[in-house]
């Protein structure tokens, strides 16, 4: 009888690897300390926007948010590189930005990249409970989405569609509904496309890559890394009905996959396009 023994695995880290791990954790906590201070200061300044009526107040709030985001990314050593495929200005009136989502840094990168017009995010309900950040979200008119309750999520999208039509609001949405952990693009939720069709406004597709290499989901190690943002051409929804939802989802997904490759990312699966019903996430571990 032959007995085979596996060779022991060498788990020893080199000196340079150990130093990089320590520095990655140190960068995270230094950036976190800066974030806390910057959040308190910029939230306080944001309150002045409430005293200014109309678009000027919203622009002030967005200026504060962009300054906050740019400062954090500088502290994290994550420069944002932006590519726009269209030379035309953004669509007039309200419209939707649809972007993939890898990391919390994606949000900051979009604040820096999307300078053309004031916008708000459709954000998960849990963020509205975070001190300072949640208060800013409410004051700035962000769209609250309850991922735990389908009926409330649909209701929030219906209100958002009315706000987009009547006020010309621009909303940024993550159709995956969560962050991917491996850098690929997850299946899309149907709700955001119901919103687009209800509002009858264009979708501007966006791809972001690099943020997942700077700060991965479920980790506290921060690595300085460029974040690339590619902004595509608008996809029109005017005249489409809810029966066209899946086709609109397919066209938008293919557009974002193309932009993602242009950003330098590896291939993402085309299928499945649609996230299974009843599941809050679809993340790949």
Regions found by a protein language model. Give the residues of each.
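Generic preference for hydrophobic
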Residues: 82, 97, 121, 229-231
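A short beta-turn/loop motif at secondary-structure boundaries
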Residues: 86-90, 221-222
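Catalytic core of membrane glycerolipid acyltransferases/transacylases, capturing the structured
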Residues: 46-63, 73-75, 89-150
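Non-catalytic C-terminal accessory region of glycerolipid acyltransferases
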Residues: 2-18, 22, 154-285
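Hydrophobic alpha-helical segments typical of transmembrane helices
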Residues: 68, 106-109, 132, 191-192, ...
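A transmembrane-helix-recognition feature enriched in membrane-embedded lipid enzymes
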Residues: 14-81, 135-139
